[in-house]
Amino acid sequence: MESLKRAWNQLVYTFSTEDRYAEYTPQGSTNVVGGEPFDTSNASRIQLNEFVDGAEVGGNDGVSECLLAWRHIDSWCSEHNPDLYATLSSPCTNNDIMWAEKDLAITFPAAVRASLRTHDGQEDVESMQGASGLIYGLKLMGLEEVVIMTRTWRNVAANLQRQMARMEQQQRAKSSSELPQTVTPQAVKQKGYGKVDNQDYHANPHLQKDISQNYNKQFKLDKLPKQGSIPPLAIQPVYAHPGWIPLVTDHAGNHIGVDLAPGPKGKYAQVILFGREFDTKFVVADNWGDFLLGFVNDLEKGNWLLVDNTDDYLNGEGDLVFVDHATRGPILNYLAVLKKRSWEKWQSTKPTQPLTSASVASFSTSSSVVNRPTPADAAGQARKTQGYSPMVPGASSNESVSFIPDSDVIMEESNLTQTDASSKGTTKPATPNPMTAPTVIRVSTPGSPSAAAEAPEPPKKATPPKAAKETKTPTVTKESTPASDANVDTELDSKNTETNEDTRATNTAHSMAPTVSSAITDLTAIDEPVATAGKPKDTEKTDDAKDVHEANKQDLTKANEAEAEENAVEPKDNEVSADSKVKARAESKSDHDSKTNNIPEKKVPQVTAKALPESDRGQASDAASTKSDKKAKPAEDPKEHDLKIEKLNEDFETVAL
């Protein structure tokens, strides 16, 4: 009867007690598990500042944030998704937390304790219709699930440690020549464990399993990928660790948990992402309270959406998913969102590293950044105009170098653009366009003889040679004449032709000084009335033309005398008397004058010439002679030509005697 009563009381206690880790006792004063009593008088209090073996407790960090976050979560769930609010479990007792800590040989952080004392995770959402995970589809695990999942991951970590130890032992055995090498036979092709004879089982106790085809290894990969963390050195670079306590799961082997064994640059009780898909672990919050408060901020910002993929009205409001309210983009996995935020936070706080020797070693020759030696006499000005770039460590002043930035080196785009512009300025100087470049002509005056020497020569590409010659000719302005004035133009051309012939005659008779000089004087006297004919009113312009003509004659005389000294003797038949030639020219011109007087009065075009300095008169005469040669000479009577030749021969003989 007593035993029946005790069994009944134990059954009632099992359904009514909140201490899930405590057993029933008839006295009711203590709850004993394994014979060790715990005081339950202060079970409603949250224990803080517990001792952690080998580490310092984080204190009460995150407790206030955790309590504030749970108030907002309860309010939001009851308003927007009552079915989700119904999945939240009742609080844990203090004894439950203590026995869980004893089983795991840890002490939960204060923020985790406060969370468990508010809600012991979620109920079995898979068995409840229309229920989903609280953290955007991720389930918040209860205390019992936390203990089970922690033990599972600890088994994984222990197996990894044993595998690594076995691999190290095999490497040492291979490197040691003293130990005998055991030979492992080929796998038996029959089902079940094969029989092995004459093998040393003491050297390899697992030999029977190794050679069997039915033995399934626990780890499929021969070598795990390299493990890392963001930020670096904040989490230990291992696949699994006994100090990682999972609190949230996606039912696929990935978790959000607290790290009780952080890396050198980590923080105790930091919230991390780890699991089968995270070879690189991420720190997402400093403590559990900050993580829950971040989740509440996403809810308050509107980064959520309830999705119902079924037509069943009993299915509830739908699943809670993450959608960015600012962009209204697609549905995102919350683990990926946390991963991205952790990366961006680390990048924003990452300091800019200075230029190191490792990054200097990555310099290679190219033309992106150009350093060229500058002349010693104009070093300062050359650095401003020739694209001078400051030298960098490890570079030479006589070679072109370019900097290839590493992943940890930041180069300013403005500096690169500036350097490219300077390098272009040094390699290809700007050349003026020959079609559009202006031509500047400076005429030296008698008062400034050095002006012509000081004038800069125009670029060869800017002005063609023909254009340069035309600019130095005396300016001659002619009025446009109608077709009826063609005869007058012919007469002017004949005059220019005669002037050119007179010049050549002077060159041939330069050795006859008195006669030739008198002939040139007579020729000038004859040309003057012809040049002034038809324009008696423009006396000033004709005077200027006379001066130019006389200056040209003087220059030609000097040049001819110099040539005469070089040519001592010339054939006698080719010498022509200047006096006879002058007389012949005078007769021909008189004939032209008589013909001109018989022509009815017509407007004669005015020919004006600007006075040029002495330095340019020779060039003007050469250009005039070249122009006159190009024009067609008038037809000459053969008889008159013979008479002219005879007169010139007679005059030459007279002068020679």
From Swiss-Prot:
Gene3D superfamilies given in the database record: SMI1/KNR4-like
Listed GO biological process terms: fungal-type cell wall beta-glucan biosynthetic process; regulation of fungal-type cell wall biogenesis; regulation of mitotic cell cycle
Ranges of compositional bias, category Low complexity: 444-455, 473-482
Assigned GO CC terms: cellular bud neck; incipient cellular bud site
Biased composition, class Basic and acidic residues, residue ranges: 492-504, 535-561, 569-604, 627-650
Cross-referenced InterPro entries: Knr4/Smi1, Knr4/Smi1-like_dom, Knr4/Smi1-like_sf, KNR4/SMI1_regulator
Compositional bias segments (type: Polar residues): 174-187, 416-436, 505-521
Segments of this protein annotated with the region Disordered: 168-193, 366-402, 416-657
Domain of life: Eukaryota
Entry's family note: Belongs to the KNR4/SMI1 family.
Protein name: KNR4/SMI1 homolog
